[in-house]
UniProtKB/Swiss-Prot annotation:
Record-given protein name: Prickle-like protein 1
Gene: Prickle1
InterPro entries the record matches: LIM2_prickle (IPR033726), LIM3_prickle (IPR033727), PET_domain (IPR010442), PET_prickle (IPR033723), Pk/Esn/Tes (IPR047120), Znf_LIM (IPR001781)
Gene Ontology molecular function terms on file: protein-containing complex binding; zinc ion binding
Lipidated positions per record (S-farnesyl cysteine): C828
Domain PET residues, every copy: 14-122
GO BP field: animal organ morphogenesis; anterior visceral endoderm cell migration; aorta development; apoptotic process; axonogenesis; basement membrane organization; bone mineralization; cardiac muscle cell development
Amino-acid biosynthesis found in the keyword field: no
Length: 831
């Protein structure tokens, strides 16, 4: 018996296996299938599975096997045939299920049959794809469809889901083959919640699908939604409350969640309320509803300009903040009666730039033909400048800078207010009231004269040192200066530099003794071209740093630039340059001075007749009396018709308004022109020094040599030297600022005539000696004595240098003209 059963067992085992893809002679082991079509020989099974996709072949323990199990559950749901697999059916529904399942099996269920097409079937066509099938090919036949209908193995799929019919089980309905699931749905609706066939009389239909009445509820809170509002999420219904709490999107603009009742705009995973306020440009807030927009970095913009962060209504310049601040202060200064300073700033910027290149940023030109290089070559040895003129103008700068007791309150900068209000160690004191100053001008008190012993070791003023101008420039660039960008009109930066000079004891008693000689007007023609106006250039740099002159009054100031080519340079759009390289916010004020000054030079006027000064002792004016020059240099002074000095006359349109000073009315209005010149005197000086050299050497006075000077110093009294040193420390730091004005103001001669002698006192030689004024007192105080310098000329009494006052140079305009005609001072010795 076992021997008879052995062939049958081997045949059964062979039916459960398939041959390998290789030849049987290769010796490879046969692979098992999880399922094989019934009634086929091994070679026929191999041909059938060869027609299927590899991933769908049901090898044992293969993805194809898992796919087969999944398709069995999906295509043939057990709850469609068996009551035990249903969750909640009434007794009536259970009966209906049984009837329904039996009817389907009876009327539609079938299994496909695998056959090889015979050679006689020459015109067989696949029912699914419509392509012709040849004899000898494997084909699937469905008995319910008819004997002549066949399909390719890969085309035997459900008509609804287009999936291969698992295990060749099909349901035939209306000429189409279906899987068990979709065939049942053709007859009865299926609940989307429980996946069961709905046998009840009522159901809920939504979104093209059906639910049991009790199954159509919120997935979160299980609230029945029949007849209510709901929201579908991934095929599941939610009530509005649960959906907002779980899945509501938040607006990118306002941050609030977008409710179910609100329309929303969505782009690239971002959401906005569909309102003009929320769905708008991130930069200009323009509504983008119905408009194209530009997304960038999570934001939406209306244009490329807005996406770059630019304001189309504002300036795109990087210095617009500085420019707007300067414009505001310029407008405020005009309302307050203060000058906009645009013309001075343009000229000073031109001085610091090459003559033909306005964009050069340096303080001195690198080319030999630049204007700053030429100015540097004027006086290289004039590092410490004319003491007499400097002390006169600088004392007036300090006086006028602190004139208004409440001027500090007009400035917005806190540091400027402190400097204006308190000064540095009471150096700048509040001046007396306007009434007192009209009555009399006080002499400088002794306590204002600070004699610092360390001043003897300083041979230059602080601002005159080579590195100082660069240091203060960098300081202002860093925002450390009081008026670094010209944001407010005020003298704080200039005054602070003067205070620093005093603190460092600049230009002490032992100053370079050649400066007196080199700074005097008579010696200007001896200056070598290699020399530079160091202090004038420093003052220009400092003026550019602060962006505001010390005076800042709205009265037009004279423009005393006498270089031949400078006015041509000045005419070329000087408003394009400002202190810091930005557009000058005060461009409208550029023509007030340049046009008037040129006008005054084109139209020469009558020369003011000279007046001989009153015979009074030579006295040095104190800080309170020495305000900056208040005189407009009109054409009667600048005109050189009678002096043979080549000074170009400006056109009529650029002439400054001439101001005539009536010194006999000084008692009634002594302070109407107080804030006229301050730092401008420093910058103007650099230009006029060039024309001063045209005086020949024969017009100079006899001067002391260094050896004679040492002997002269030893002969001076100790008390006189002490008084001199005090004044030298106070006024010595102001260097080289006013030597150019001496030639051009005979009106100032009248102004200072009360304090000087006639021409003899200004131009007296050192051959005679007198002790009458060696120790003079005035108003109970010793007369301040200027510092002695080498190569310095003195008056007959040897009490003080004649150039200690600017007055001699104001009078030398007339004396030099006399000398040209053969008239000399009675005590003058021409060297």
């Amino acid at each position: 018996m076992p021997l008879e059963m052995e062939p049958k067992m081997s045949k059964l085992a062979f039916g459960c296996q398939r041959s390998s893809t290789s030849d049987d002679d290769s010796g490879c082991a046969l692979e098992e299938y999880a399922w094989v079509p019934p009634g086929l020989r091994p070679e026929q099974i191999q041909l059938y599975f060869a027609c299927l996709p590899e991933e769908k072949v049901p090898y044992v323990n293969s993805p194809g096997e898992k796919h087969r199990i999944k398709q069995l559950l999906y295509q043939l749901p057990p709850h469609d045939n068996e009551v035990r697999y249903c969750q909640s059916l009434s007794e009536e529904e259970k009966k209906e299920l049984q009837v329904f399942s039996a009817q389907r099996k009876k009327e539609a269920l079938g299994r496909g049959t695998i056959k090889l097409l015979s050679r006689a079937m020459m015109h067989a066509v696949c029912e699914q794809c419509g392509l012709q099938m040849n004899g000898g090919e494997v084909a699937v036949f469905a008995s319910r469809a008819g004997p002549g209908v066949c399909w390719r193995p890969s085309c035997f799929v459900c008509f609804t889901c287009n999936e291969l019919l698992v295990d060749l089980i099909y349901f035939y309905q209306d000429g189409k083959i279906h899987c068990g699931r979709h065939h049942a749905e053709l007859l009865k609706p299926r609940c989307s919640a429980c996946d069961e066939i709905i046998f009840a009389d009522e159901c809920t239909e939504a979104e093209g699908r059906h639910w049991h009445m009790k199954h159509f509820c919120c997935l979160e809170c299980e609230t029945v939604l029949g007849g209510q509002r709901y929201i579908m999420k991934d095929g599941r219904p939610f009530c509005c409350g649960c959906f907002e709490s779980l899945y509501a999107e938040y607006c990118e603009t306002c941050g609030e969640h977008i409710g179910v009742d609100h329309a929303q705009m969505t782009y690239d995973g971002q959401h906005w309320h569909a309102t003009e306020a929320c769905f708008s440009c991130a930069q200009c807030k323009a509504s983008l509803l119905g408009c194209p927009f530009l997304p960038k970095q999570g934001q939406i913009y209306c244009s490329k300009t807005c996406s770059l962060g630019e304001d189309i209504h504002a300036s795109d310049s990087s210095d617009s903040a500085f420019q707007s601040a300067r414009s505001r202060d310029s407008r405020r200064s005009v309302r307050m009666g203060r000058s906009s300073r645009s013309a001075d700033q343009c000229r000073q910027s031109l001085l610091l730039s090459p003559a033909l290149n306005y964009k050069f940023p340096g303080l001195s030109g690198s080319a030999d033909d630049t204007l700053s290089r030429k100015l540097d070559d004027v006086s290289l040895s004039g590092q410490g400048a004319g003491f007499a003129h400097e002390e006169f103008w600088k004392a007036r700068v300090d006086q006028e800078a602190s004139e208004d007791p409440e001027e500090w309150a007009e400035h917005e900068d806190y540091m400027t207010q402190l400097l204006l209000k308190f000064g540095d160690k009471n150096l700048f004191q509040q001046p007396p009231s306007e009434v007192d100053m009209r009555a009399s001008e006080h002499w400088i008190p002794d306590n204002m004269v600070t004699n610092k012993p360390e001043a003897k070791q300083n041979h230059q003023s602080l601002a005159s040192k080579k590195y100082q101008s660069d240091m203060y420039w960098a300081q202002s660039q860093d925002g450390l200066g009081d008026s670094a960008y010209g944001s407010h009109p005020g003298p704080a930066s200039s005054r602070r530099l003067q205070e620093l000079d005093l603190d460092h004891g600049a230009a002490g008693y032992n100053h370079d003794q050649t400066q007196w000689y080199e700074d005097s007007l008579e010696c200007l023609s001896d200056l070598k071209p290699e020399q530079s106006v160091r202090d004038s250039m420093d003052s220009l740099a400092l003026s550019n740093i602060t962006g505001a002159s010390v005076d800042g009054e709205s009265k037009p100031r004279p423009s005393l630039y006498s270089l031949q080519n400078f006015e041509e340079i000045e005419a070329e759009d000087c408003e394009k340059m400002s202190n810091m390289g930005t557009l000058n916010s005060s461009m409208l004020h550029r023509s007030a001075e340049s046009l008037k000054s040129l006008n005054s030079e084109l139209c020469p006027e009558k020369i003011i007749p000279e007046e001989k000064p009153v015979h009074l002792p030579v006295l040095r004016r104190s800080k309170s009396q020495s305000r900056p020059q208040q005189v407009k240099f009109s054409d009667d002074v600048i005109d050189n018709g009678s002096y043979d000095i080549e000074i170009r006359q400006p056109p009529m349109s650029e002439r400054t308004r001439r101001r005539v000073y009536h010194f006999e009315e000084r008692g009634s209005r002594p302070h109407h022109h107080r804030h006229r010149r301050s730092r401008k005197s420093r910058s103007d000086n650099a230009l006029n020094l060039v024309t001063e050299r045209k005086y020949s050497a024969k017009d100079r006075l006899r001067l002391y040599t260094p050896d004679n000077y040492e002997k002269f110093i030893q002969s001076k009294g100790a008390r006189e030297l002490q008084a001199y040193m005090q004044n030298a420390n106070l006024y010595g730091q102001y260097a080289h600022t006013t030597s150019d004005y001496a030639l051009q103001n005979p009106g100032m001669t009248r102004f200072l005539g009360l304090y000087g002698d006639d021409d003899d006192s200004w131009c007296s030689s050192s051959t005679s000696s007198s002790d009458s004024e060696e120790e003079g007192y005035f108003l109970g105080q010793p007369i301040p004595q200027p510092r002695p310098q080498r190569f310095t000329y003195y008056t007959d009494d040897l009490s003080s240098p004649a150039s200690a006052l600017p007055t001699p140079q104001f009078n030398q305009r007339t004396t030099k003209s006399k000398k040209k005609k053969g008239h000399r001072g009675k005590n003058c010795i021409i060297s």
